[in-house]
Amino acid sequence: AVMAALLCAPKALGTTIGEFSIEQIYVNVPELDVFVQATDAQGQPISPDLVRAAGVELYLGDEKIPTGNIGMANEPICYVLAVDNSVDETTLKEYRIALRRLISAKGAKDQIMLYTLAGDAACVLPATIDTRAAVNAVNALESQEENEPNLVQAATIIYNDINENYQSIAPRKVIFALSEAGNTATSTALLGAVAKDAASRLNMPLDIFVTVDD
């Protein structure tokens, strides 16, 4: 099933509804089956039955999504990490730290894919659940300040890789793109180019992370 974040759902989820909160919402396209991650006051997952009973209303654009088919979102996730390594070594070091933290927090069946964007975009780690392999790939990232990213090419490569290997990649997929805040053109192009291909055509959530100088 193709999983997509509901566009109507707030980015910073966790809005309290009764005695539980909605942490994350996905919708299966085109069937429009709804999946949620909801927790109680102690942060423990709760049954979808409670979400349905609370009368939660969901909308995709102007269309109301029926909530009678709500289910628990507990399938593995593939984290597609797109790193703009055309930054300096100091910034890339910050990226490595953040990526290692993400990898260490992933579920046992969650996958990591890693792309570098400097110059010609390349997949340096195909989808894997191997935490050690993912950390080693992150540690091996090198700064290539002289090579500007080709973001249109990068978006196409990411889309094609996911599309061609769709069945072997985890059911839920999300792209994390890391870029520098100072490079506005890069950040904007990443959001536009990647969203156009991988995010919209594959119905994948997209997050852009940028670094900011103190």
What role is predicted for each listed range?
Residues 12-14:
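Boundary at the C-terminal end of the N-terminal hydrophobic targeting segment
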Residues 17-18, 22-80, 86-93:
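Acidic, polar low-complexity linker/tail segments
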Residues 70-79, 86-116, 126-133, 150:
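…and closely analogous acidic/polar surface helices at protein-protein or active-site interfaces
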Residues 97, 119-207:
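Exposed acidic/Ser/Thr-rich ligand/metal-binding surfaces
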